[in-house]
Amino acid sequence: MTSYGNGFRMMAKCLLSLRSGYSVTAPVSKSMANVLWARYASTRIKTPPFPESITEGTLAQWLKQPGEYVNKDEEIASVETDKIDAPVTAPDAGVLKEQLVKEGDTITIDQDIAVIDTSAAPPEGGSAGPKKDEVKTADADAAKDLSTPQDSSKPIEEKPMPDLGAEQKESAPSSTKPAPDAKEPEFSSPKPKPAKSEPVKQSKPKATETARPSSFSRNEDRVKMNRMRLRIAERLKESQNRAASLTTFNECDMSAVVALRKKYKDEILKETGVKIGFMSFFSKACTQAMKQIPAINGSIEGEGKGDTLVYRDFCDLSIAVATPKGLVTPVIRNAESMSLLEIESAIATLGSKARAGKLAIEDMASGTFTISNGGIFGSLYGTPIINLPQTAVLGLHAIKERPVVINGQVVPRPMMYLALTYDHRMVDGREAVTFLRLVKEYIEDPAKMLLV
């Protein structure tokens, strides 16, 4: 114990020397050593690494509060940037001593945001947070026990009580009983009653007049945009201002794809675990059509507003995914080299990460062409906006049965409208129309994609 105490004081002495900048030769007392150790045995938590080109973010939420014990690498807060949400993790285990910023504050690169006391020992029952919750739940349970000490069996009987049918059965007799009750006073005093009822009728309109304003609310909710929504708004407006956007339309018969999917979806799901959808067919069709119309997969780059046309022999396919915070476009790398099942699997993985807010900046960077499927929400027709610096975006829509003339006969077919918005600065109308026609041909004859 003596050697441990001397070593502890020696460490405190060194800490004091380092912090003060002077050489400390006098002995350090045990109490002073404890004070110094508690003060300096701490770790400052900095902002997480930001993606390239991002210099600041917003502290969205604290997941741990001061006084709670945190483990190493445990998430204690989340930071919202223009593109992704980044978790803040504890570099060491200890008690969260102080929060240096508040929720909603703007934070910059390498900024200190919290302090952890690394000298604190972990509590026996885990972190302090769960203990507080356990106390609250215990108090709530105790309150329930005190409120119903002898009716432990009643909750089972009370469950059907909220049934509207039961309430209506009880209220029905009561609604019929006032009629005879109302008649009895009329027999006892027939004349005074009508006289009293007249002022009541006059007062009822006043009651309804005062009740009308409360039944029609005119409140407004003003919600400040989060960083992602602000960035989305800026980019969409930038696209409209910079690109010479034009949209061309077509429609395709989905009969072949629907039949193919119906025939093999269960077998594919059983063997591979991949749930085949329609997006993979359109993704494959687009990558095949790009081989003939490479401008669709290009971009305009260079100084000023752009003076260089860029053509590519690969396709990094951006897939639009709706999340609670806004639309994101994770990227499937080298989609042109992937099979239908590989594309479908990648879409499922990226979609799950997007909805869970777990996308990394690498997952969304440098797409070359975008597909947006508004049909899953019931959209019948629409014009998508180009995702700069890309030059085109394909919009898919709902599949609806419509009458179609085939070989002189009107027959019902599952049809889908397609919308291709393109930047007319790089893509000519002929190229855009040809590209969309090729996509239509591949979808209406999926086997053709395997032969190209």
From Swiss-Prot:
One of its GO terms (biological process) is tricarboxylic acid cycle. The active site is at H424, D428. Residues 42-117 form the Lipoyl-binding domain. It catalyses: N(6)-[(R)-dihydrolipoyl]-L-lysyl-[protein] + succinyl-CoA = N(6)-[(R)-S(8)-succinyldihydrolipoyl]-L-lysyl-[protein] + CoA. InterPro entries: 2-oxoA_DH_lipoyl-BS, 2-oxoacid_dehydrogenase, 2-oxoacid_DH_actylTfrase, Biotin_lipoyl, CAT-like_dom_sf, Single_hybrid_motif, SucB. It comes from the Eukaryota. Residues 119-225 are annotated as: Disordered. Binds 1 lipoyl cofactor covalently. Belongs to the 2-oxoacid dehydrogenase family. This is Probable dihydrolipoyllysine-residue succinyltransferase component of 2-oxoglutarate dehydrogenase complex, mitochondrial. It comes from Schizosaccharomyces pombe (strain 972 / ATCC 24843) (Fission yeast). The gene is kgd2.
